[in-house]
Amino acid sequence: MTKGLIFNIQKFSIHDGPGIRTTIFLKGCPLRCKWCANPESQSANVQILWDQKKCVQCLQCVKSCMHQAISCREEEIHIDEELCQGCLNCVSTCLQSALSNEGESKEIEEIVRIALQDKDFYEESGGGITISGGEGMSQPDFLKELVKELKKHNLHLAIETTGYIPKETFHELAPLFDLLLFDVKHYDTNRHFEGTGVHNEQIINNLKWAFHQGLEILPRIPVIPSFNNSIQDAAGLASLLTEIGLKKVQLLPFHQFGERKYEMMHKEYAYKNVKALQKEDLTEYQNEFIKKGLDCFF
């Protein structure tokens, strides 16, 4: 069986589709959103994170690395991602648990076994399995095999997607799911590029195609300060959705859950110290969608 690179399997998830769900997070994403809450999801490779607070500078990790991917400079541990082979020797060597890995190759059989552990909860709550990321469609061959195995157990399947997928791949994968949780970040392609590193034409085309195929879609808008949180942005996004024919939308207020991860990955975080948004901050924003006839909720 094809293996997949997974960075988390989260049980009892209640925000990634209906009911109680198990969410399977795949590594790899074509976008580079400046506010990304899961920066460890972007790379399609295993990554090593260093927690300075736990490190005692014993340097056993440096000595254990057969690929010279780890160095210590100015009392900080640095991992060269180009040299790192993901062998995890350094992680197992560190007695202080200062090093951890993001990403692990897993067999489909193991993932299905974990997913089935909570089948009773899915059935009682109307839940199921959600594929997320990164980009849920970032590993297409693995995903097809995984879905095939999960469907043998009559599980409700959802997928979180950026929509930034080659047309042929999206057309093949999207119909496999009972629900598409489809990120819609901006109506303006240039603003979209500024915030995510990619333009939005391909995303919108895939969204339109999915709608006209009759697929179940829940558009979800991450509301991000200085990117798409103005009333004008809300109006533009509402117009985009209604022009396609969509009837509902979920708003996801900006949060700071991922800030610590950037520190551990030695990455600059563009939204450091930016205040999180609350539902009550977005009343007028929400009303723009409601005025256009959309069922808009959090």
Predicted features and spans:
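Auxiliary Fe-S-binding modules of radical SAM enzymes
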Residues: 1-18, 218, 223-298
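N-terminal pre-triad scaffold of radical SAM enzymes
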Residues: 7-60, 77-86
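Fold-independent oxyanion-binding glycine-rich loops
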Residues: 9, 27, 39, 81-82, ...
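Hydrophobic packing within well-folded, soluble alpha/beta domains
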Residues: 33, 55, 65, 70, ...
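Iron-sulfur cluster-binding cysteine motifs and their immediate structural context
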Residues: 34-41, 60-79, 89-105
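Extended, non-globular alpha-helical segments
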Residues: 50-56, 103-110, 118
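Conserved AdoMet/S-adenosylmethionine-binding subsite of the radical SAM
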Residues: 109-258, 263
